[in-house]
Amino acid sequence: MTKLRKIIHIDMDYFFAQVEEKANPSLKDKPFAVGGTNPKRGVISTCNYIAREYGVRSAMPTAIAMQKCPNLILLNTDFAKYKAASAVIRDIFYSFTDKVEPLSLDEAYLDVTDVKEYKNSATLIAQAIKQEIFNKTGLTGSAGVAPNKLLAKIASDINKPNGLYVITPEQVDSFVKDLPVKKLFGVGKVSQEKLKTMNVETCLDLQQLSLATLLDKFGKFGNNLYSYARGIDNREVNPVRIRKSVSVENTYLEDLKTLNACLEKLPSLYDKLTSRMTEEHYKSIVGIVVKFTDTKFNKTSLTRVAKTLDKEAIKSLIIELYQKQNHPIRLIGIGVKLGEVEDRQMKLF
């Protein structure tokens, strides 16, 4: 019989904004956002919950955010501050278990299956972790507890902020039935729209499709869909998780017709990229990359060997790549290559 696992997913609440709020308590009762300080061309990185009540959201253009909330306070990002808080939180995770898989500065998976303390209760362990984080940093996070990574991550988002949601093995079947397929790991807009054309919007709908049908429509990803729809996820929490790259990209509603228009998108992309990187990522950078997709859906990219993440170096790549374009730009992606340099044509996307 397979041993049931006990997985916790911790996701810090509005992390950048909460760190700023802790550093400056006068912000606590005011709507504010981090990033996007250029009112005309900026993009919001994150915001506090008061700002969200006005409809402000992450990745929203600052101009739109200011329309929704004219009194919105805009703060520059301070990654040194966020990394310092993240390091404290990471140490707390490791004080409970060695099986920690960091995903970014503000979230991680923990496998507490073999933790004997707290009566071997994942729920009690999650509560203790949340309390320890608050005691040492004054910050709150939300936790999801479940038999696997898929469900733990979904659960951590249910009772935000400062929430805890538990899915026991006995509750898995009933929980997934009404779960929207868009919540499943790996299901993006394209897959979601494709499933919608097949009259699939919930996991119960997805369960009606055979494995053969899913493999035919989605290739190898069909295996994942078949399992995820049933609340099955055999991915391990990998404490030595090796990533070959970290990258971000954005598709723009209005085509970027000039070089300046492309360069104006760099600050928000750069902030988004750095927010996804951990201290370990910074230590293992071996290259940087820029990718474009134009209005004809032609994809081009440039890579350079590099030891550090340098905004000016990425800017020069954008300029060089743009000069090779014949059509307006629809998508821009930037990223870093991690590990050993295999060749000059490093593929991140």
Curated annotation (Swiss-Prot):
Mg(2+) binds at D11, D106. GO terms for molecular function: damaged DNA binding; DNA-directed DNA polymerase activity; magnesium ion binding. Its main location: cytoplasm. Its EC number is 2.7.7.7. GO terms for biological process: DNA-templated DNA replication; error-prone translesion synthesis; SOS response. One of its GO terms (cellular component) is cytosol. Pfam families: IMS, IMS_C, IMS_HHH_1. Residues 7-188 form the UmuC domain. Poorly processive, error-prone DNA polymerase involved in untargeted mutagenesis. Copies undamaged DNA at stalled replication forks, which arise in vivo from mismatched or misaligned primer ends. These misaligned primers can be extended by PolIV. Exhibits no 3'-5' exonuclease (proofreading) activity. May be involved in translesional synthesis, in conjunction with the beta clamp from PolIII. NCBIfam families: PRK02406.1 (NF002677). This is DNA polymerase IV. The gene is dinB.
